[in-house]
């Protein structure tokens, strides 16, 4: 950590010191970060963003898993929805901003739509791939014991697909988080994305950098404490 601070401070002095534009010193960023923590602005912005992305990710999870099951269970669904989902997944979330504004206006629904479209494809593909990669031997054993299609799906396919699904879930979260940050640029709301853009517009570069660090820290914490632990649990129970 000290090495990175030294490199940063050296770069700050090389590029002009106090006269540099858009490249604040590490100490000014640390001070801005401290102020954001103590005045509560960082916590309120982060809480609003996490709540917002939670709604969008939950909706994406519901739709993505449903579409993944349809694609896996039906050849017609695979033919009709497979290429469409793959195409949606390949689009950067920022591409959905014009449609969100056109269809929903400048409001929370537009942000929710961007989060949904940014993450639903990843969850759908993870669901499909997890179910597809179940060994044929498991299918034959289930058939031998007389399991119905839905019994096989619930008791054989779903547990076997959980390790792949857990990895896809973590990836879907990362897409949802990045989509949220893009979506919060649409309208000035309480959130880390809007706070980042507001700092840029007001030339508050230390606060802008501090907000970026807040975003990174929050991303790492959620990834490690929530999805990392979930993935670890799934692999210990159903994986290898």
Task: Tell me the role of every PLM-derived stretch.
Residues 66-102, 125-132, 140:
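Cytoplasmic-entry segments and transmembrane alpha-helices of multi-pass inner-membrane transporters
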Residues 10, 53, 57-69, 73, ...:
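Hydrophobic positions within alpha-helical transmembrane segments of bacterial inner-membrane proteins
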Residues 113-117, 149-183, 206-210, 214:
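Transmembrane alpha-helices
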Residues 126-168, 192:
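Short cytoplasmic-facing helical segments at TM-TM junctions of multi-pass membrane proteins
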